[in-house]
Design a protein with these regions (language model features):
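Zinc-dependent deaminase catalytic domain
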Residues: 1-168
Length: 168
């Protein structure tokens, strides 16, 4: 008889996005994204971080500074955009993107332009901000669905064990 306590596809792909977020060097906000084809094949992942070639040690991670250039905001590439760029030109039309935090307006534009048709997210903590409302307006106009993932899973544990310890 097969197991019945396995996670569903949405939980699996959101788990991949959350795991990708663990790669972020941002001390305040770690976001990951996972792009999935219509037939549940992972196309790409990404997380928020500095652009390739820009040292994580030489660019600021601060939220506040003397000028905007002294903050992380003009430099950091968001998880959604990194996942789209990491797809390296693969066709994303009709795909889904899983992301822990609802996309900002800039990421919403990239999602729309790339042909992604659904956003699955966990948190909408900036729901009342103008930029979040702008994101939703654009996604609605472009016919991109967005759905908050409702799950009763509080957490998942990754066990790194030697192969000989895995149940057969």
């Amino acid at each position: 008889m097969k197991r019945t306590d396995y996670i569903n596809w949405d939980e699996y792909f959101m788990g991949i996005a959350i795991l990708a977020a663990k790669r972020s060097k941002d001390p305040n906000t770690q976001v990951g994204a996972c792009i999935v084809s219509q037939d549940n094949i992972i196309i790409s992942t990404g997380y928020n971080g500095m652009p390739k070639g820009c040292s994580d040690d030489e660019f600021p991670w601060d939220r506040r500074g003397n000028t905007d250039a002294d903050t992380k905001y003009p430099y950091v590439v968001h998880a959604e955009l990194n996942a789209i760029l990491n797809a390296n030109g693969r066709d994303l039309r009709g795909s889904r993107i899983y992301v822990a935090l609802f996309p900002c307006n800039e990421c919403a534009k990239a999602i729309i332009q790339s042909g992604i048709k659904e956003v699955v997210y966990l948190s909408d903590k900036y729901a009342d901000t103008m930029m979040n409302l702008v994101s939703k307006r654009m996604l609605d106009a472009a016919g991109v669905r967005y759905t908050r993932l409702n799950t009763d899973i509080g957490s998942l544990t990754l066990d790194f064990v030697a192969e000989e310890n895995i149940k057969k």
